[in-house]
């Protein structure tokens, strides 16, 4: 995507490198999104950056990522901070971000919105064991609530 640099936020590798990491048991979680532009693959690698024996880590991911992280690290090691936004507001924000792109891809925005409705369904939230939700209506209030709860851990 425009503006992304290798090693800043993401690391980009080819299929062969990904398969080698899988064979070596280094892939913590992976998923593929069938986008308008073709499949996009994302994964998290155990490269030593996440050291739960001595540090805490914050990762941003989907329910699928959360479930895979629990399987890899153990359920007692992973605490969900489920942030939700009302559908209309989420769509408004996504549309505003897309309009800022040099070449907005509204078809992909719509695909992602519909996919998210399935990926974050009430059924999947329940299956993941998510008990607490943070509503991101007022950003500052949402952040204060999250910070308060994180301090408990």
Predicted regions and their residues:
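Conserved AAA+ ATPase "sensor/coupling" helix adjacent to the nucleotide-binding pocket
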Residues: 24-28, 96-101, 149-152
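Switch/connector loops and helix/strand junctions flanking conserved nucleotide-binding motifs
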Residues: 2-3, 67-68, 88-94, 142-144
């Amino acid at each position: 995507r425009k503006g992304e640099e290798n090693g800043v936020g993401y690391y980009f590798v080819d299929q062969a490198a990904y398969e080698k990491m899988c064979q070596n048991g280094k892939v913590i979680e992976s998923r593929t999104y069938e986008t308008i532009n073709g499949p996009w693959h994302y994964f998290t690698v155990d490269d030593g950056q996440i050291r739960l024996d001595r540090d805490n880590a914050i990762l941003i991911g989907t329910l699928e990522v959360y479930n895979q992280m629990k399987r890899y690290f153990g359920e007692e090691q992973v605490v969900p901070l489920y942030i939700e936004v009302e559908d209309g507001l989420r769509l408004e924000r996504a549309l505003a971000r897309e309009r800022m792109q040099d070449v907005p891809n509204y078809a992909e925005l719509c695909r992602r919105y519909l996919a998210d409705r399935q990926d974050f369904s009430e059924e999947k939230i329940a299956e993941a064991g998510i008990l607490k939700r943070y509503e991101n209506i007022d950003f500052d209030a949402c952040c204060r609530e999250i910070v308060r709860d994180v301090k408990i851990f």
